[in-house]
Amino acid sequence: MRICSIGECMIELSNVEHNIFRQSFAGDTANSAIYLSRLGAKSSYITSVGKDFLSKKMLNFLNEEKVQTHNIFQSKDKTLGLYLIQNNKKGERSFFYWRSNSAAKTLLENVNSKNLFNQI
């Protein structure tokens, strides 16, 4: 089975202890691509990232999960979106997003969609 996911994988910061945060990568579409790969599907991901250290780290993360990244575009002047998860005393989560400079927000503006979908 061959499946392609399109979306945004972001930098995730979650509070581990008081003022200590764990950094990972997540996003609904990226998580789906990873889980499908783990189940044995030929999974690929389409998004746009920057050329910075964390963008490269995210690409490595997806490759380690055996998600194909050949249709991930790199922006010269944009980077990854970021979100923070905060738990209140009852354990309920709140999310805070920083996406104004996200490369994925402009993915379809900078890509020939017809050519891309023909490649898939």
PLM region descriptions:
Residues 1-68, 107-109:
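Glycine-rich phosphate/adenosyl-contacting loop at the front of the ribokinase-like
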